[in-house]
UniProtKB/Swiss-Prot annotation:
Keywords on record: Cell cycle, Cell division, Cytoplasm, DNA-binding, Septation
Source species: Listeria welshimeri serovar 6b (strain ATCC 35897 / DSM 20650 / CCUG 15529 / CIP 8149 / NCTC 11857 / SLCC 5334 / V8)
UniProt keyword Transcription regulation, yes or no: no
Protein name from the UniProt record: Nucleoid occlusion protein
GO molecular function ontology, one term from the record: DNA binding
InterPro entries to which the protein is assigned, alphabetical: Chromosome_partition/occlusion (IPR050336), HTH_ParB/Spo0J (IPR041468), Nucleoid_occlusion_protein (IPR023705), ParB/RepB/Spo0J (IPR004437), ParB/Sulfiredoxin_dom (IPR003115), ParB/Sulfiredoxin_sf (IPR036086)
Intracellular or extracellular location(s): Cytoplasm, Nucleoid
Family, per entry: Belongs to the ParB family.
PANTHER family recorded: CHROMOSOME-PARTITIONING PROTEIN PARB-RELATED, NUCLEOID OCCLUSION PROTEIN
Length: 284
């Protein structure tokens, strides 16, 4: 089966056609002979949903078989249906119905990615790693991959940029401690150490994206020259205070003169200071 066929599928029933193509029968395979998909993009499974599925299986059994491929004699890798496998495992059942398919690594990786994308269950980091895996496997561009999985090229590129973040930040996204927008905003910071430090601030203060972006602007602003901005208000404040002092003195002199006191008032200005001389005669 050509690898490109996998990327052209949009609907879930079409994906089912792929994994069931050439199916002869459903087998009951031992649970201890089955292991998870090495290309499974999902690393975080919702245990509540697994438990809910297990309760359904306990009552109705496994309605839809899992799909596997034989890796070694009597050892099988899951292609599709890992949640069903985990649910059956939690029930401690010995066997699970399965369909065996002969698919290569690239086809298995593509099916795992597309299945999860259709269900919209991947975290942004899981999705990014799946895209990276497929790009590494196939000599295709981001644009070609985007067309095949029904995404825009910019969406693929934005997801891949998340993989440039430190492991601690990626893990926080996986665990849903911060959002994808939080994570993308951290890319504006130059060093991993600064990114990790800000991650701690976000978690400690429960900042939303807007607050996080404001903090990033503060951090970036520290590196910019601010001497002129700091001294200008200071000079304005000093100039304003001097004018107030000068006006107060002049008003006082005027009041004294209005009361009949004869005095001389002289004002001189230098580069460094104002000089005021007031002469009051001892005798009238």
């Amino acid at each position: 089966m050509p690898f490109s066929r996998l990327f052209g599928k949009k609907e879930k029933n079409q994906m089912d056609d792929i994994v069931e193509e050439g199916v002869q029968r459903v087998l009951e395979l031992p649970m201890d002979k089955i292991f998870p998909n090495q290309f499974q993009p999902r690393t975080v499974f919702d245990q509540d949903k697994i438990d809910e599925l297990a309760r359904t299986i306990r009552i109705h059994g496994v309605i839809q078989p899992i799909v596997v491929r034989e890796m070694e004699p009597d050892y099988y890798e899951i292609i599709a249906g890992e949640r069903r496998f985990r649910a059956v495992l939690s029930l401690e059942l010995e066997k699970i119905p399965a369909i065996i398919q002969n698919l290569d690594d690239e086809e298995v990786a593509a099916i795992a990615l597309i299945e999860n994308l259709q269900r919209e269950e991947l975290t942004p980091i899981e999705e990014a790693k799946a895209y990276r895996s497929l790009l590494d496997m196939q000599d295709v561009t981001q644009e070609a991959l985007a067309q095949r999985v029904g995404k825009s090229q910019s969406a693929i590129a934005n997801k891949l940029r998340l993989l440039k973040l430190p492991e601690a930040v990626q893990q926080a996204v996986l665990n849903k401690q911060i959002s994808e927008r939080h994570a993308r905003s951290l890319l504006a910071l130059e060093t991993e150490a600064t990114q990790v430090d800000l991650l701690a601030e976000i978690e400690e203060n429960h900042w939303n994206v807007k607050q996080t972006e404001a903090r990033i602007q503060e951090i970036l602003g520290v590196k910019k020259p601010t001497t002129t901005k700091k001294t200008k208000p200071k000079r304005q404040a000093i100039s304003r205070d001097v004018r107030i002092a000068m006006n107060t003195i002049k008003q006082s002199v005027t009041m004294v003169k209005d009361n009949g006191m004869d005095l001389d008032f002289k004002e001189e200005e230098t580069d460094d200071f104002y000089q005021i001389t007031i002469q009051i005669p001892k005798k009238k």
